[in-house]
Amino acid sequence: MRVVILGSGVVGVTSAWYLSQAGHDVTVIDRESGPAQETSAANAGQISPGYAAPWAAPGVPLKAIKWMFQRHAPLAVRLDGTPFQLKWMWQMLRNCDTRHYMENKGRMVRLAEYSRDCLKTLRAATGIEYEGRQGGTLQLFRTAQQYENATRDIAVLEDAGVPYQLLESSRLAEVEPALAEVAHKLTGGLRLPNDETGDCQLFTQRLARMAEQAGVTFRFNTPVEKLLYENDQIYGVKCADEIIKADAYVMAFGSYSTAMLKGIVDIPVYPLKGYSLTIPIVEPDGAPVSTILDETYKIAITRFDKRIRVGGMAEIVGFNTDLLQPRRETLEMVVRDLFPRGGHIEQATFWTGLRPMTPDGTPVVGRTRYKNLWLNTGHGTLGWTMACGSGQLLSDILSGRTPAIPYDDLSVARYRSDFTPTPPQRLHSAHN
C-alpha cells in the first residue's frame, strides 16, 4: 500500500519506519529541510512512561491562578479570544478532576510503557545510537505535600505493573550523587528505574536515514497547502502545483494538525509552548547521572554524553515562538539550584518549541471517519516517550494486524459523547 505521512518529527519518522517494515511504500512530506527540525529538535530528552500524566489534574485550576503572580511559574496563559483557544481550555478544565485524571493517566502510561518496549526492540534490531541512557528517572519533591501526593500516581503505576522507589531526601544521592550537596532543600523523590533518556533529534535523524535506506522517500522543503477529499476518502495532498497521491494518509503534523484537518476531522490539538537550554558539561560529577524532574517547577534536567538538557514550562499562547528571557532565567535558576557545578550555563543554547497537546493529555492515534485518513498526533510533552509505540500501533491498525495493546480510547472517536471505551488490560510486550 502507498502511504503518505505528513510530518517528519519523531512521531512521523517512527510511523514511517514501522509502516515500511510492514511492507508499505512510504513517502514522508515536510516543509523543513530535514527531520526533527521543530518540536523534536531540543526537547527534554526524557523517555519516562511512568511520569506520563496529563497537565489537566486536580488542583491545577487553582494553581494556575497562583502561578499568574509567580515569577518562575510552570504554566502561563495569554488569552487571545479565539474560539479554539477558549474551547480547548474549557475542555482541559473539565478533565481536572480525579476521575478524568486517573483515566487519562492510565491510558497514557499504557501507551508509554508499550512504547518503551517498542524502542528496546527497535534498538536491539538496528543498533541505533542516540546518546541514550537507561538510568531511570527521579522526580524531586520540595514540599511534604508533594511527597504525600505521590501516592495518587503510585496507584496508577502499581496497576500498570511499573516498578518504582519512593525515596526520602537522605537517599536521593544513592541514585544521583550530585544531589548530596542540595538534599536539605528536598523532601524526597519518586524514582522509576526503568525509564530512559536520549537525544530525540539525533534518534529521529538517524532513524530517518535507516528508513530511507529501507526504501522510504522523504520530501523535504515541501510545504503542504491542503488535503483534498471527496465523499469518505482523501484523494491527494496539494503541495504548490503538485498533487501527491497515495492509498492512505497519516497526519503527524503535531500542533499544525488541527488547522490542516479543518473541515475534515475536528481534533482538539493545541500548541503548548515550551523551552529548553542545552548546556555543555563542565564537571561530570556535578551533573546528573540520568534525568531529574523537578515537581515544583515542572522542569526536567537530563544528562546526555557531554551536555545537560534543561526543559520545561508550558505556555498557552497560540503559535508564538518568541524566546522570552524570563523563561531562560527560570531554567537557569532550577539547574543552578540543583546542579550548581554541572555545566557552563553562560554557554547554553536557548530554544523553544510547540508541543501538540490535547485537553485530556492523551494523543490521537488511529483511524478517522475517512476510510484512508489516519492520525498520529497530539502527544504533547511526551512525543519522544510515546513515539515508537504510537508508530507501531498505527502500523498495526493500518495494516490490519491486531495491536499488542488496547487502542480504541486513543482514537479521535473518544471525543464523541456516545463513546464507550473497551476496559484496558494489562500491558503486553512489543512485537518480536
UniProtKB/Swiss-Prot annotation:
Record flagged with keyword Secreted: no
Reactions it catalyzes: a D-alpha-amino acid + A + H2O = a 2-oxocarboxylate + AH2 + NH4(+)
Enzyme nomenclature, EC number: 1.4.99.-
Pathway membership: Amino-acid degradation; D-alanine degradation; NH(3) and pyruvate from D-alanine: step 1/1
Keywords: Cell inner membrane, Cell membrane, FAD, Flavoprotein, Membrane, Oxidoreductase
Pfam family, one: DAO
GO CC entries: cytoplasm; plasma membrane
Cofactor: FAD
Subcellular compartments: Cell inner membrane
Keyword Membrane: yes
InterPro entries, per the entry: DadA, FAD-dep_OxRdtase, FAD/NAD-bd_sf
GO biological process: D-alanine catabolic process
Gene3D superfamilies xref list: D-Amino Acid Oxidase, subunit A, domain 2, FAD/NAD(P)-binding domain
Membrane-topology descriptor: Peripheral membrane protein
Sequence similarity: Belongs to the DadA oxidoreductase family.
Primary role: Oxidative deamination of D-amino acids.
Protein name, per record: D-amino acid dehydrogenase
